[in-house]
Amino acid sequence: MCDVTFHSNALNRDMQYRVVFPGHITAGERFPVVYLLHGGGGNFRNWSDWSDVARYAERGLILVMPEGSDSYWANSAGRPQDRYEDYVVNDLISDVEDKFSAAKDRANRAIVGVSMGGFGAVKLALSHPDLFAFAGGISSAIDVPRRPFSIKRPAQGLRHRLIFGAWGSQTRRDNDPYILVRFADPGRMPYLFLSCGEQEGLLRANREFAALLEERHLRYEFHVVPGGHTWTQWNERLPSLFDSMWKRIHPED
């Protein structure tokens, strides 16, 4: 495991990410890469500090955990310098593939997140289906661009307006996973793994999103599991997620 600092052109500043490697690497060998996005209020250390995700590297995976602040992993509508989507899909992937023994094709690339990161993982995969073969959203804040926070929670509404743009704006539509699915070509989309706890306020939105995936004939699976919105619960969902992922990404020939 190591922490990397690199310069992001999209953000015009240095950023950090954590990497976990397979235990045995031979010269010339390339490994699938899983990008793990943290949730709101978190940081790039959360995945390795609060879960046992590192053990899945032993399956022959490179795990990458980038810093994302509270960005929702989106290009901010109100702060042009905060282009977090571009940072991930352009700068981060390029840096990882330049520095490490990473496979460089879609079939060997996955993206996964929890909460805010679950939204980010699903949204980035739907927006860039040429980059990812698999996306996993655990307890995803999947409906956040369509929540009228400005009415009941003004401070949060202002922050979300800064990120996603005004209600009904094109930037908000561009960041709405429901709209992306509605106009998606099912044959081009990555496989989606969704999981949400029975005690979570996000369950209804995740059920609705899964129903839309079914309607649009996208490839997916959706699990409703016991528990709430905690790292303890998320850690328990990792075995089924990685088992599903392993069926859909593979090492380079």
Could you say what each language-model-derived stretch is?
Residues M1-D253:
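Non-catalytic cap/lid and distal C-terminal segments of serine-dependent acyl enzymes
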